[in-house]
């Protein structure tokens, strides 16, 4: 069917009368949705999505997944193309046949040990203690168990209770007689503030990342999470991903210079108040590092996980093609 000038003008007039400009159709931006985790690096993504250059050419949106299981389901269904993920989950998905690869790392260690009353100052002091851990068999649990195994601490002598989410862990921690909880930022800072309201003192325990570095003789960093992407989607949008990398780097610089404003943005996405987000920025060890630039550290982390439990990676280490950027 062809359209002459008179028909085009009639359609334009009708669209205008309906409050729709024909130019809107020509200017429609491609959707670029990033599925973020309920943790601090999503603040970096949120700022990049609102202030970055990519937003000028694409409709950049951030949506938060609630649990690693929802993340896995989103990837398996094909709905999730760009997503923040615990660093082991990307490998696991790839080894299950999902065509995903790693784009970057956004935190070098986001998990904190929060203690009730008195600080637990060493991993050895966890013996005999009641500890809350969210996300069984995912990153907080993995780091704790691998560290204890490396230090020859019997995991059966630590009383671990699992919570479905960090938010649930906070509620249980404050209401029940747990000695400590392992929480990602900003939920670690949120529990400090919530505890004050109910008259409980919460303090930070030993630094998990530093203890990890000493135990495994590595740099004091754990490449815990970053952005992974569908390979085909990445290959078709390499220019956009380069812009995203610059936007994320600029966003992190802006966040550290404008913490209060950054917390206001983050509170729109995370289950934590602005004050907790602002307080938790330092402990989140935020970074924006391309996967290829941190490849040695990432592979060393994966090798540690393989020794601890190969199932965490789906049974094998990733190939070089896993590192997309």
Language model segments and positions:
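Conserved C-terminal helix/tail region of periplasmic/extracytoplasmic solute-binding proteins
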Residues: 299-325
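Short, solvent-exposed loop/beta-turn-alpha elements that line the ligand-binding surface or hinge
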Residues: 53-57, 211-217, 287-295
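Short, glycine-/small- and polar/acidic-enriched structural segments
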Residues: 27-154, 160-161, 179, 185, ...
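Structured segments of extracytoplasmic/periplasmic soluble domains
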Residues: 48, 74, 129, 147-151, ...
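Secondary-structure end/capping motifs
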Residues: 234-308
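Secretory targeting signals
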Residues: 1-3
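N-terminal export signals
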Residues: 7-26
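Pocket-lining segment of extracytoplasmic ligand-binding domains
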Residues: 87-89, 168-171, 175-265
């Amino acid at each position: 069917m062809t359209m002459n000038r008179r028909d085009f003008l009639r359609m334009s007039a009708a669209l205008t009368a309906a409050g729709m400009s024909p130019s809107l159709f020509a200017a429609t931006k491609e959707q670029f949705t990033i599925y973020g985790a309920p943790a601090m690096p999503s603040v970096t993504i949120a700022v990049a999505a609102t202030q970055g250059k990519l937003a000028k050419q694409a409709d950049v949106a951030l949506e938060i997944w609630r649990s690693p299981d929802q993340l896995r389901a989103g990837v398996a269904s094909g709905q999730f193309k760009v997503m923040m993920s615990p660093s082991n989950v990307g490998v696991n998905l790839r080894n299950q046949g999902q065509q995903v690869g790693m784009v970057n790392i956004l935190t070098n260690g986001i998990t904190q040990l929060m203690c009730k009353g008195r600080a637990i100052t060493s991993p050895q002091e966890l013996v005999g203690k009641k500890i809350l851990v969210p996300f069984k068999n995912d990153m907080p649990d993995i780091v704790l168990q691998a560290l204890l195994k490396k230090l020859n601490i019997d995991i059966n002598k630590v009383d671990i209770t699992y919570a479905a989410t960090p938010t649930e862990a906070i509620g249980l921690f404050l209401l029940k007689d747990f000695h400590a909880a392992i929480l990602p930022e900003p939920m670690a800072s949120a529990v400090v503030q919530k505890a004050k309201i109910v008259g409980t003192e919460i303090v930070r325990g030993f630094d998990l990342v530093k203890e990890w570095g000493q135990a495994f003789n590595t740099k004091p960093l754990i490449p815990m999470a970053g952005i992974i992407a569908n390979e085909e989607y990445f290959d078709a949008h390499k220019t956009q991903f380069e812009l995203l990398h610059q936007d994320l780097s600029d966003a992190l610089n802006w966040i550290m210079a404008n913490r209060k404003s950054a917390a206001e943005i983050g509170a729109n996405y995370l289950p934590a108040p602005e004050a907790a987000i602002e307080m938790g920025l330092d402990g989140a060890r935020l970074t924006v590092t391309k996967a290829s630039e941190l490849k040695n550290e990432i592979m060393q982390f994966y090798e540690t996980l393989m020794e601890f439990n190969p199932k965490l990676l789906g049974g094998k280490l990733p190939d070089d093609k896993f590192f997309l950027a």
